[in-house]
């Protein structure tokens, strides 16, 4: 048995959610041989019709689980999704975002290599979010190397397949409202010398909706990250 949980956070994605679900639902159908795999989207207190559309989609798609929580940001929503998948009995957790920037056709290459690794992380060699976001990612990788001594090509790609037991182990090191869990997940997997690889993925520009993270927010998050990294380093 290898129950797979594909999990995504969603915030104000009414322009994208239906297309995203249509794209990813066939993936979970294909990998539901045991009957225990699920596609899970966690609504982060959206102010639009995202959650309503999710509920409507679930009526005709039994493998889709729509969840909702008060707004707490992308990081806390990802942690919520990981925790739900673990408690639901997932063996494997695949995380991506609900904005349509990732390609479900690239999932199979990850899945087919799962037996060789504890985690397979996406590597965005071309970032559809533009040069500023690509620069931010390079800075993140430099900081991860500086604080934790690990070298990674992409610390935060929202396209990652991980063993649930490992995610559970590392999730316990993070507060429920921590805002950069994927960066730390990547860091932990590499730092503790788990079997890890990075695979190149495509990453399209956002076609619809508005990115809730702008440069001003990135700077604020970055300032907090420096403090958090110092504290998290003490607990390695």
Please give the residue ranges for each predicted region.
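Donor nucleotide-sugar binding loop of glycosyltransferases
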Residues: 13-16, 46, 74
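Acceptor/aglycone-binding surface of glycosyltransferases and processive sugar-polymer synthases
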Residues: 69-87, 92, 104-179, 206-216, ...
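Short, well-formed alpha-helical segments that are part of the catalytic scaffolds
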Residues: 13-30
């Amino acid at each position: 048995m290898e129950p797979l949980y594909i999990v995504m956070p969603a915030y104000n994605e009414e322009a994208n959610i239906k297309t995203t679900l249509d794209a990813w639902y066939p993936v979970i159908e294909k990998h539901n041989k045991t009957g225990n795999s699920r596609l899970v989207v966690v609504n982060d207190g959206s102010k639009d019709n995202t959650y309503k559309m999710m509920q409507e989609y679930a009526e005709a798609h039994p493998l889709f689980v729509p969840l909702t929580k008060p707004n707490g940001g992308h990081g806390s929503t990802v942690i919520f999704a990981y925790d739900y998948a673990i408690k639901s009995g997932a063996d494997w957790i695949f995380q991506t975002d609900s904005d349509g920037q990732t390609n479900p056709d690239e999932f199979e290459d990850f899945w087919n290599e799962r037996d060789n690794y504890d985690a397979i992380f996406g590597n965005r060699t071309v970032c559809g979010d533009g040069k500023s976001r690509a620069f931010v990612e390079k800075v993140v990788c430099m900081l991860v190397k500086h604080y934790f001594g690990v070298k990674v090509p992409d610390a935060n790609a929202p396209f990652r397949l991980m063993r649930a037991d490992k995610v559970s182990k590392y999730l316990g090191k993070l507060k429920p409202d921590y805002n950069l869990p994927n960066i730390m997940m990547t860091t932990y997997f590499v730092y503790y010398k788990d079997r890890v690889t990075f695979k190149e993925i495509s990453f399209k520009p956002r076609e619809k909706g508005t990115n809730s993270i702008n440069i001003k927010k990135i700077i604020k998050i970055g300032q907090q990250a420096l403090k958090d990294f110092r504290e998290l380093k003490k607990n390695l």
